[in-house]
């Protein structure tokens, strides 16, 4: 596992849900590659965030936040998740995967494998 920066904490307003891109080097056998992965960050309070993997737990399609319905939605097969990542509708077998996070000098760091 490694910790990678997801952005400055103050760029995520309290009460917001945002998609942001993280970039890191993933090692595979004898080589490594740079991977760019979108994640979802929800900011509840000044110091409280929840970071989600943005892949639907059904087949891995991208999930996005719909501010009108206030839920995460997957356009591929109609999957829907509540603000906490719990399944509301569709075929997803489990909630959205959460990413461990920490604040380090004002930067949100997320743990990736």
Locate predicted features.
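N-terminal pre-ligand scaffold of iron-sulfur
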Residues: 1-57, 61-66, 95-113
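Soluble extracytoplasmic domains of inner/organellar membrane proteins
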Residues: 53-59, 73-82, 89, 95
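Short Cys/His-rich "knuckle" micro-motifs
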Residues: 64-67, 82-85
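Short linker/helix segments within small regulatory modules
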Residues: 67-69, 90
């Amino acid at each position: 596992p490694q910790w990678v920066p997801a952005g400055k904490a103050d760029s995520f307003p309290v009460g917001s849900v945002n998609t942001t891109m993280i970039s890191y080097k993933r090692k595979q056998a004898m080589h490594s590659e740079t991977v760019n992965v979108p994640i979802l960050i929800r900011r509840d309070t000044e110091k409280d965030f929840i970071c989600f993997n943005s892949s639907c737990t059904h087949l891995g399609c991208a999930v996005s936040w719909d501010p009108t319905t206030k839920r995460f939605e997957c356009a591929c097969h109609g999957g829907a998740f509540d603000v906490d990542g719990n399944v509301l509708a569709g075929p997803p077998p489990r909630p959205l995967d959460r990413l461990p996070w920490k604040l380090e000098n004002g930067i949100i760091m997320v743990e990736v494998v």
